[in-house]
Amino acid sequence: MTDRGSDGATVESEDLDTNRDNSVDASPQRVLITGGAGFIGSHLSELLLDRGHHVTVVDNFSTGLRSNPARVRAVATRHPRYEVIEGGVSEVLPTLSPERFDRVYHLAAAVGVRLVVEKPIHTIETNIEETSVVLRFAAARALPILIASTSEVYGKGVRVPMREDDDVVYGATSYSRWCYACSKAIDEYLALAYHRESGLPAVIVRFFNTVGPRQIGEYGMVLPRFVRAAMAGEDLEVHGDGRQSRCFCDVRDVVRALPMLIGNPACAGGVFNLGRDEIISIKDLAELVVATLGSRSRIRMVPYEKAFAAGFDDLAVRQPDLTRIRGAIGFAPSIPLVQTIRDLAAELTEREGEVADMVAAGGAR
């Protein structure tokens, strides 16, 4: 199948089975994952270890749970090739040699609507500075690298569904809400510049709403917030009129796509949407959570002005066009949203105490 790359060039690709690692080299890889103790990173670590790869994680635990690496170790005890280095990317990577690794996944970032709105300096500096450090690290040995980006890069959304080559429009710089989108767009520009100028095999993934076990709601993530409220019999707070619509994809489906993208030379220099394309409104999502968990919770509408700063801007619809990633790797998510809700509820029950301790401590160390 033929698709257009990020620079307009055609890319020849073939449909691939999403249940296996379609890497060019099936031998064990030495993998570095920044942000590997976080939500997506811990699931990716677990997947790669299960496939026999060596995994080194760099994470400062600012938003990741300390139990995540322990969970990975428990599952991957038969694969004693797992190392966790605590610290920021800018601190740790200068102490490591690129010669130690075969691939790099850069997942570390400032994430979550509330964190972005409340800490814009942290958001901008973390996203841009750390991505620059990681790209220089990978470029020193021309390591294949996957850069985690976001659907937020589409800004106000010129059209729906959103395609990787769409133009983007952001709000005024006086609203910090857009600093996350702009910082991740800069990350993309930088990664693509490394690819064009030095041949760095970099691939960019724009994650849409990714959900599932190990996700926390303290920084604005909607599904774990709804699930926790429903389990406690509390009101589910829906911001605005609730008609804003999103597409939710299970993290276990998402991480299966990442090794295939980084392992396919035809994907280098490309930008790929990653998620589901089935739309659900936030109000309908709240109702689905209540029904799935058999909760007696009510749904309460909350104006954006009460949830965030005045002038907060949100998109009516965020839906990915998945044509490119389907053509490149045959991506087809299989876990239904109802199953994700049930699994998240079960996992939230297990770790409720740790989340409370992290929030009380302010999240970051």
Residue ranges and their predicted role:
Residues 4-8, 20-24, 44, 50, ...:
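C-terminal substrate-binding subdomain of Rossmann-fold SDR/epimerase-dehydratase oxidoreductases
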Residues 2-210, 344-348:
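N-terminal Rossmann-like NAD(P)+-binding domain of SDR-like oxidoreductases, especially those catalyzing
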Residues 113-116, 212-213, 307-311:
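A short acidic, helix-capping loop that chelates divalent metal ions and anchors anionic groups
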Residues 186, 190, 194, 226, ...:
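Hydrophobic alpha-helix immediately C-terminal to the catalytic Tyr-X-X-X-Lys motif of short-chain
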Residues 66-70, 188, 224, 283, ...:
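Short, surface-exposed alpha-helical segments at coil->helix boundaries
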Residues 85, 158, 175, 215-219, ...:
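Residue-level signature of the cytosolic catalytic core of signaling kinases
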Residues 60, 67-70, 97, 157-160, ...:
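Short aromatic-enriched loop/helix-cap "lid" or pocket-rim segments at secondary-structure transitions
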